[in-house]
């Protein structure tokens, strides 16, 4: 349900739903069909339920908060397991010209009572945070920590810089999720078909969100036939091909690995062409790395620095000019505690 209040399931708490449409003679239920399809494909499902409702007559009154809770209950108890509930802070006028004072505490408590393992996204989490823009780009320094005390969802949220970077000593573990649309807008319009991002552009965005320790939320709007438009589908398949090819061959797979408290050396049998290195922290032990540098060479006694970075987190993908090297050293130059690097891998991305 987006801000217009139109429910893609036949809600008992609205008269602005698929039930009132001509689609399938009012017998359709998009959420049910999606739930069944996700279950069949083994895909977990998330749900967006906008608190803002530009149609409901109770919006802007105390009654509406209860309506919203019952709306959530319908979805969260009637359509199987959801892994994520997505909230933004939109709070405009309803049909009566009034705005709503959302009772987010009740909303959150109710949602977690219906599905205790649900992850909730918003400006302040509590589980996943917005990254402060809708371009899909996370800062190169990205802490999974965030201070939320004194802030609220929407206009009273944390500063954009904090959302994009996290907080070095944040009190809560709230990783970032980067949202962006595959085309100019969030909904399908035929005249925007030429604005669809290419597979290469999507891969570049992947490097700037997942490759910076975040999560990637890509909006792909269906057309009026309920299908992804050919341009969108082609871009998605191209993105998959590029991504699969990029990570197909781990150049460090059979390397000799030498570890110290603050460094990892990778020794290969022969020099390889390389332009990307992926690092991962064991984040079950927390996010520890503050800064690092990567050096390499073809003499085990002579290393030259060719890349530097800040945070790592779940995943950090560093790209650089293609070089032919045999030896590599990843040195943690600053960390909060003993760094625990769970993976180091190397790749040659196509130009």
Please place each PLM-identified region on the residue numbering:
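Mature catalytic domains of secreted/periplasmic carbohydrate-active enzymes
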Residues: 1-298, 306-310, 314-320, 331-343, ...
